[in-house]
């Protein structure tokens, strides 16, 4: 499996050179932003790892070989489906982290009893951790009824371009199969994959009802397979790769570049 983009180009700088004289000192915004930027890339990397595993040929690592070719094919597909679902979870986590990445870059962490909390300047480690945890708790989806982003746009209008990017992305992404399948796996159950279902034995029985007036015959649900949420594993893996290449990476690249341009983080944070 080949991807178009190097995700590590999205990460914070691994090394920098700068003149100490006149260099901008880091503040909490810089630290929080770079921290979330790095965490986002780590989760993105995990998604890629499991995508690569969907094409593994190292099956002896996962189970002992069997003489039954049908059973062996089923094992391959079942494990590949687990790798796919794990990658699906990580990709969706990356999307959610992108909201936090934007939120913590803004010039306040949270409101306490209606008072704006200023997170500029340098903080003791314990205070900085507490502020970041507090900020993380405030993040919701960009279109949730009580989302913080409209308020952020009023308080920090310089961040409007970045906030609009995450809202526009979410409005499109939330209706895609990538998000719908993630929500199904997370909250509702496990999907059935057509490639695996084809290998299962046929149903034991079928129940049919005939309409005496029209003669129309209707099959009644009598097997658990009748009510499964089913789709193709191969097509889903391909769709996830295309989402990575053509949707997720370009969105994150633009978002990070936009925030960096607004925030101008200190070169001392890397």
What are these regions (language model features)?
Residues 1-49, 53, 72-82, 106, ...:
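Acidic, Ser/Thr/Gly/Pro-rich intrinsically disordered interaction regions
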Residues 60-63, 100, 171:
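Short linear interaction motif-like sites in intrinsically disordered regions of transcription factors
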Residues 90-108:
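Extended, well-ordered alpha-helical segments in internal regulatory regions
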Residues 60-89:
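Hydrophobic/aromatic-rich structural module bridging two neighboring secondary-structure elements via a short loop
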Residues 43-53, 57-60, 90, 97:
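Amphipathic, well-ordered alpha-helical segments in soluble domains
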């Amino acid at each position: 499996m080949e991807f178009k983009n190097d995700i590590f180009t999205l990460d914070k700088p691994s090394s920098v050179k700068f003149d100490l004289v006149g260099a901008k000192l880091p503040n909490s915004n810089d630290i929080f932003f770079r921290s979330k930027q790095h965490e986002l890339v780590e989760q993105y990397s995990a998604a890629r790892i499991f995508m690569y595993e969907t094409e593994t040929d190292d099956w002896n690592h996962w189970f002992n070989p069997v003489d039954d070719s049908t059973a062996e094919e089923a094992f391959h597909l079942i494990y590949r489906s687990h790798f796919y679902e794990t990658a699906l979870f990580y990709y969706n986590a990356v999307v959610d982290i992108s909201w936090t990445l934007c939120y913590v870059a803004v010039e306040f962490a949270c409101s306490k009893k209606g008072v704006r909390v200023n997170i500029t300047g340098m903080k003791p480690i314990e205070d900085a951790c507490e502020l970041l945890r507090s900020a993380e708790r405030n993040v919701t989806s960009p279109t949730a009824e009580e989302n913080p982003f409209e308020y952020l746009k009023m308080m920090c209008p310089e961040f409007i371009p970045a906030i609009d990017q995450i809202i526009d992305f979410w409005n499109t992404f939330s209706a895609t199969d990538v998000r719908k399948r993630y929500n199904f796996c997370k909250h509702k159950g496990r999907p059935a994959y057509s490639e695996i279902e084809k290998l299962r034995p046929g149903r034991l029985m079928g129940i049919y009802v005939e309409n005496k007036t029209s003669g129309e015959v209707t099959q009644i649900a009598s097997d658990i397979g009748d009510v499964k949420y089913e789709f193709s594993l191969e097509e889903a893996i391909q769709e996830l790769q295309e989402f990575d290449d053509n949707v997720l990476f370009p969105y994150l690249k633009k978002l990070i570049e936009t925030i960096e341009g607004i925030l101008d983080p200190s070169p001392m944070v890397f």
